Amino acid sequence: MAKKVQAYIKLQVAAGMANPSPPVGPALGQQGVNIMEFCKAFNAKTESVEKGLPIPVVITVYADRSFTFVTKTPPAAILLKKAAGVKSGSGKPNKEKVGKVTTAQVREIAETKAADLTGADVEAMMRSIEGTARSMGLVVED
């Protein structure tokens, strides 16, 4: 028989830098999960990812206090800021442009996020990423 799910916890944790301090500790502690066990497993799984990059993670906590987790790809906005070389998006994206990204960079981001994005093909996923870029005040160039 399958284990009974007690809770789902969604967090964004910096790659390779999970530790028991907030937000990880309190979120897992409330469910009675072994925090250090999660931190070690998460850090081991995200070794190959650039350190400090926020990684969304969904933790499934079972009634017997065991857990499993699934890591996702970094948010598109973070990848776009990194590609454009800017610290933050524009406060007024329609009026003030803060940076530029090329179509090739957008394609690369779409292919990186392909596992998490819903789209018929790479072109559809690229349009989604381009929309995110525009809403951040980034210009997409050919």
UniProtKB/Swiss-Prot annotation:
GO molecular function term, any single one: large ribosomal subunit rRNA binding
PTM statement from Swiss-Prot or TrEMBL: One or more lysine residues are methylated.
Alphabetical list of Pfam families matching this protein: Ribosomal_L11, Ribosomal_L11_N
SMART domains registered for this protein in UniProt: RL11
Entries under PROSITE patterns matching the protein: RIBOSOMAL_L11
GO terms (BP aspect): translation
Keywords of this entry: Methylation, Ribonucleoprotein, Ribosomal protein, RNA-binding, rRNA-binding
Subunit structure: Part of the ribosomal stalk of the 50S ribosomal subunit. Interacts with L10 and the large rRNA to form the base of the stalk. L10 forms an elongated spine to which L12 dimers bind in a sequential fashion forming a multimeric L10(L12)X complex.
Function comment: Forms part of the ribosomal stalk which helps the ribosome interact with GTP-bound translation factors.
Similarity remark: Belongs to the universal ribosomal protein uL11 family.
Protein's name according to its UniProt entry: Large ribosomal subunit protein uL11
